[in-house]
C-alpha cells in the first residue's frame, strides 16, 4: 500500500541556502555597509562587523536582530532584490532538482526561519523555487515608500517555530524537519524524522547527543525519504546517514 506523503519543514539559512560564509541577513548587512547611499563611518563599520561576527558564532542573537533592524532602516527594497539575486546563485542545480522533484512527488513543504522571510522568499523566487513551498514564514520587514522602516518579529526565537507547528496541528510522526543548527533544535527534537545538514562535516560531533540523521548535501535526503516511506517512520528504523 502506498504511504501518505509527509510534510517537510525546512530551515532556510544554512539549510536551503549554503552559508559560505554568511547567511542572508549577514549578507544584506555587509552589502549595505559597503554600498549604502550614505557611507558607514569607521565606528559604524566596526560595530557592524562585530555583530556579524557574533551572529556567525551564534552569540548575542537578540542584540544582532535589534542592531540589524536599526542599521537597515532606510534601505530601498531594490537593494534587497540585488542581494537576493546574488544569493540565489548559491543554491546548486542539484539542490534545485531535489526541491522540484519533492514538489512533483506531492510533498507539502514549508520554510520556517528565525531569519528574515523577505530574504527567504526573494532568494527562492530568483532561484525558481518559491512555488515549491506552501508557506515561507519568518520575521518580516516593514516598509514605507519602499524603504525599510522596521521589522515584524513573527518567529524571533527557535521555540516559536515549534509553537507554529503545533498551531498547524501537524504530527511529529508525519513531519520531517530539516535544519542546520541551534535555532532548529526545538523542531528537530520534536520531529520523528529530524535531519541535520552538515556540509562542513563538523556538526556531527557537536550534535552527537541528539538522535538526528546527518546529511552533507541536499541530494542525500532522497535516501532518507525512501527509507522513511518503507518503514514505520521511527528513528530506530531509519538509519542515520553519515
Identify the residue ranges that each predicted region occupies.
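Short, acidic/turn-prone active-site loops that include or flank metal/cofactor-
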Residues: 137-143, 199-203, 218-220
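Acidic, Mg2+-coordinating phosphoryl-transfer loop and its flanking beta/alpha structural elements
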Residues: 19, 113-114, 172-213
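Short acidic-hydrophobic, aromatic-tinged amphipathic segments that line or gate anion-handling sites
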Residues: 211-221
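Histidine/lysine/aspartate-rich catalytic loop segments that bind and position anionic ligands
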Residues: 129-155
Amino acid at each position: 500500500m502506498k504511504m501518505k506523503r509527509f510534510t517537510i519543514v525546512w530551515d532556510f539559512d544554512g539549510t536551503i541556502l549554503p552559508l559560505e560564509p554568511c547567511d542572508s541577513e549577514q549578507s544584506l548587512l555587509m552589502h549595505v555597509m559597503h554600498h549604502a547611499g550614505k557611507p558607514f563611518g569607521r565606528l559604524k563599520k566596526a560595530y557592524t562587523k562585530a555583530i556579524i561576527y557574533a551572529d556567525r558564532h551564534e552569540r548575542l542573537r537578540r542584540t544582532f536582530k535589534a542592531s540589524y533592524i536599526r542599521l537597515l532602516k532606510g534601505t530601498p527594497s531594490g537593494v534587497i532584490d540585488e542581494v537576493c539575486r546574488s544569493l540565489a546563485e548559491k543554491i546548486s542545480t542539484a539542490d534545485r532538482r531535489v526541491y522540484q522533484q519533492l514538489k512533483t512527488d506531492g510533498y507539502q513543504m514549508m520554510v520556517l526561519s528565525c531569519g528574515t522571510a523577505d530574504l527567504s522568499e526573494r532568494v527562492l523566487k530568483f532561484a525558481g523555487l518559491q512555488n515549491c513551498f506552501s508557506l515561507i514564514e519568518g520575521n518580516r520587514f516593514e516598509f514605507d515608500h519602499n524603504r525599510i522602516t522596521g521589522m515584524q518579529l513573527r518567529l524571533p526565537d527557535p521555540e516559536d517555530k515549534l509553537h507554529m507547528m503545533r498551531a498547524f496541528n501537524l504530527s511529529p510522526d508525519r513531519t520531517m524537519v530539516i535544519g542546520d543548527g541551534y535555532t532548529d533544535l526545538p523542531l528537530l527534537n520534536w520531529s520523528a524524522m529530524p535531519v541535520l545538514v552538515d556540509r562542513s562535516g563538523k556538526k556531527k560531533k557537536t550534535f552527537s547527543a541528539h538522535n538526528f540523521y546527518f546529511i552533507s548535501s541536499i541530494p542525500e535526503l532522497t535516501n532518507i525519504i525512501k527509507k522513511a516511506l518503507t518503514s514505520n517512520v521511527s528513528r530506530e528504523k531509519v538509519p542515520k546517514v553519515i
